[in-house]
Amino acid sequence: MRIIAGAFKGRALAAVGKGDAGAHLRPTTDRVRENLFNILSGGRFDINIDGARVLDLFAGTGALGLEALSRGAAHLTCVDTGRKSLDLIRQNIAICGAKDQVKILKCDATRLSKNGDAPFNLIFLDPPYKKSMGERAIALALAGGWIADDALIIWEEGQDIVVPAELSLIDTRKYGDSRAYFLTRS
C-alpha cells in the first residue's frame, strides 16, 4: 500500500500484515483508491480536495484520508476503534509527517456523538462489509453535525445500501465484490 499522488506520493504505508480479523480490517486497494481520486479530481462532482476537511469513518489504515491530505486537503479526522487499525493509522501519519493535520478519534462510528468542530465536506465511509454498520454511522454523522451541507460522501460497501432521506445517490462504481457509492446532501 502506498500514497499514489500529491505531497506524500510514493510513500509506502505500514504493512497490514494479518490485519485484524475481528474488526474486519480490509484496506481499500491502491487501484480502487487511485480510481476514486481520479473521479474526484475529474471535476464531475462539486468538490475541491484542496483545503477540504476530511472525515474518514471506519478509517482502518487511514489511507483514504491520507491520500486526500497528500492531494491538498487541510485536515483529516480518522474514526476507528480497532487496536490494530489505530496503530496502523498512527504509523501512517508518522510516515507521511502529517501529525499536525490529523486528529484520531478512538470511537465507534456507529456511536458518534455531536461534532464540536466545523463540519466536514469530504467523507469516506468504509465499514466492515455485510454488517449494516454504514447506515447507522451515516445517520449519526448527519444528526451530529459532522457533515457539511456541500459535502460529498464516498461510501464503500460490499452490498446494496439504504440511502438516508437526507442524501442523494449521484453515482455508483463497482470494483470486484465492492461498490463505491457517491452521495450528496439532498
Label the model's feature ranges.
Residues 1-186:
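Class I S-adenosyl-L-methionine-dependent methyltransferase catalytic core
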